[in-house]
């Protein structure tokens, strides 16, 4: 006989709620199983299976209680237990698959079938527990319920796995909530589909002898207990998750701290309060090994300074830093040490020591200091060091009333030797000279190289009354009388010395050095192996030079130079063939100053280079103007000694010729004998280069310098210029006449043209004509005149 059944809507909703809650707890349990490892993971797997299984079964049990029949419902005990076992088994399968970390499609499908079968078994075994009722199932709905069970299992396993491996985020709780609703509805759907498939009939068979569960209230109590357990588990899981996160943060911080120590490039030691090393990082172990002792010997090698610092940190409980030296069998090390107190529960526990080996940096700083204060070539103090030392000495002298003597020294002929034999020989000469100077400097003396071939000696606490400065100056001069043997060369040089004394000559270091420098130049002018004291006259002379230099600089900036031209005549052709360009300085008031008044200062200060460039450019420009007007006159220019030694001379002349498109034969270069003799190889190279350009070369002031037949033979020279001093005396001194004749004859023998300068009267002209001189120049023909007057002079010449 069929039994009519009804359903309690409240209990149905309660069962669905229990299903959703069980699903949510299952998701939590799946994460527990996944994030834990080892024994802890196994405990969560077993315990979680029981909790999850009972939760799913409770949904089924409440759903069963939602069914109302015409007769009281009683349940057999053993089928109920079997249903619980099926639910727990299915839960175990689902959690086990999730814990595998990799969920393949085959594993997902297999797990879904097993879990679905377990849930279906739980349901239908639980249905069979109803006493004195025969249940007949409609096949299609029965099959649909099993399919729903498998599909719900498939979705559940997929959701379990995805959320179990998903990293925590602010959206994770929302995902789990939605997923638990989907899973709960799926499980409930399977249950109630199975209920729809069932028709209940009274079983007329007598009741069995097995145990039955009859108490409805006891069932409600069990269900509520399970629901409470689920709720408690839910809150416990949430609290556990917060605890785990906090533990992870603490663990992460601890790992970061340990990583900071372990991977720190600086040595870190943890010291006990007694000063023993408890532990260290790898860098600390390497440092101890480099020092050559063990960690147990640390206290034996610790300096007194560090020990005091250690005690101070213990006392004040504040970090401190200091530099310290450590001396071991492996050598001396320079360390920077930071001591940091470590407190636990407001009690000093240990001391952290951060130790940096600054040995290389210390040596580098020391080397930098040496490079900044010492000369790399001679190992003597340099200019900076000398100025600093002199300043300190003068400050002390001012309070103690001592005398300080400053010697300014310059090697004579050094530039000639350096240019002729090369920088290697020049450097060695400076090194040997430095050693000789150092050997005579007394204990109260200080020596430094200022640069180039200049040195300075400073005598402190000097007794000027006993002639201490004179004695030292003479010793230095005597030392340099002995030649230097360098490589295969025997080199002779001397030294010029200038002396200034404080406080007589000043109390400022730079002022004393400047005055000693002035005195040195005065000594060099008088005799290149002398010494001179600074005096007012020397200072006044230098002041005049300084004023002249300022005038020259102002003239260069404002283009206040002009060239005047003095005609040169051919004796044979009886006509003008060229001119010599002679520079004049135009003063602000319009007066002209001849070169003799400023060329010396220009040469000494180096301004002659700029002036020489202007002369070359202006002379070439004027020669081109005359050439365009049909006046084929060569223009002779004088080259200074400093410009002759310059590497820029040849390119400058070449560029200027190209600039004005001037035929090179219209330019003549005059050089003196002395400048060509300073460096024969360089001179030959320069003169040959000029000749290759097509420029004619004249030797100016011939007969007054280092006259040598060898250089007349070797150098590409075109003309000799007899010095004016011979022409002045040619009428009154027979020897001057004979020398003049000899120069002319020698020049002709060497196929050289000869020109005489300074011809001032007809008698001199006639005498030179008789001796066969080729060209004449002097006031007899014309003074040096501006270009405009020179052109008029050309026009007035009948031969032109």
UniProtKB/Swiss-Prot annotation:
GO molecular function, a single term: cyclic-guanylate-specific phosphodiesterase activity
Pfam families noted in UniProt: EAL, GGDEF, MHYT
Outcome of gene disruption: Cells do not display any phenotype.
Domain GGDEF: start-end pairs: 402-536
Key word Transmembrane present: yes
Residues annotated as domain EAL: 545-798
Main location: membrane
Protein's UniProt name: Signaling protein YkoW
Organism: Bacillus subtilis (strain 168)
Higher taxonomy: Bacteria, Bacillati, Bacillota, Bacilli, Bacillales
